[in-house]
């Protein structure tokens, strides 16, 4: 296969990037631009008209996708082929959203029945806890869930429960612990009562350093505050593949939920890793979350590339990284409940596409994954939006807004929407020198002063953005939104021909961290590592500067 950067479409896109008119001109030339460059699917509307693209750009982007075999790669993932080539694994988080009558094979076995059995087990457990049938060791009902995990087993459930706050069971609270920093755990334990607290420990191996350390400390706290070893089973459950270690810990085998190798951590919220979500919002709403993601799966598989929402978003991100040297991408959520999504999408994209070799091990000769960052509108407008408007770096943006608020109050939501739409317009349109100068008419300043100030008020514009709308934030629309970004991430990795489903950089950090831990716990002065690491270890062991 011809290298990506040697494809004709690549050369065409390079040429077009240098000569494409300003977006102001593109909108002036085509009053129907929004109608032509917007798309509705799965309860979401994507407005991609404020991107640096004309019909030729789109044509070449789709040509590039086709030359990379994108459609075949999409089907390969959904069919359970081994697309994670370094770990020899299928990638089937989509199977967690499958219908009961679907057949999805892994090693010749249909995995859908096992998925459905696990969901049924989750439903039974959720009902027991939320109904009050499940009691703590003193006979009291559960009031607090403490979810202990790290990475995908922490961030996904945390962000989803945060986003779906209006759907919470009022009788339950959920607290999330990930960092091995003791402060994280201790602050949560101060909020809960051992008699009414349920700990959900999520670790595939039951040996992840941070998760195991936090779980052992939680167990010690529980035993210190009235619980006994026999009571552990009433207050600790696990999501793990290592049943033996979980039962040795004191958990009942009936309350251990499975994990599978064909689900990566950052794609795992749809599995039993989502147990804290289900406990808080109820199993019916959890099923709606899955249904929303399933609808996006269906759209991704069936829609032509030219009308495919994840494909379009992935291609535009690729366009800016590879042809405009954009090194970051900002996600701006105009809904307080969605304030955590940028961090979730950050992990999803950067852990997936932060790669520098192709599937065959060749060094890539182009940029891959950008830095993903962002925050909550309108807060960001009074902070980092300044850089978006007048900084020297091109930073594409995604704006996300529900049309209806869960908390309608006066003019709040219409003001929120006006800021969202106004920002996308300002980024696209900018302000010319003449426009800035005209705004100063009537002031008492000299012409020289006006000219100087006008130069500082100029904004180039032509800054690209997508706008994503939904009627209202619900479990179903949230599921579709998260699946959209999952598939958008896949599209980029598939075209770049990289493995979006391993994370060897993360693994190296774990290995070296364990090595350093052994040296920190040793009585001997650190000498074997580099001079900097040795000095830092010795300073830490001394306990002061």
UniProtKB/Swiss-Prot annotation:
Protein location: Cytoplasm
Keywords: Cytoplasm, Gluconeogenesis, Glycolysis, Isomerase
Statement: the UniProt record of this protein carries the keyword Isomerase: yes
Recorded GO MF terms: carbohydrate derivative binding; glucose-6-phosphate isomerase activity; monosaccharide binding
Gene3D superfamilies: 1.10.1390.10, Glucose-6-phosphate isomerase like protein, domain 1 (3.40.50.10490)
Gene Ontology terms describing biological process: gluconeogenesis; glucose 6-phosphate metabolic process; glycolytic process
EC number: 5.3.1.9
Function field: Catalyzes the reversible isomerization of glucose-6-phosphate to fructose-6-phosphate.
Protein name: Glucose-6-phosphate isomerase
Species of provenance: Shewanella loihica (strain ATCC BAA-1088 / PV-4)
Gene label: pgi
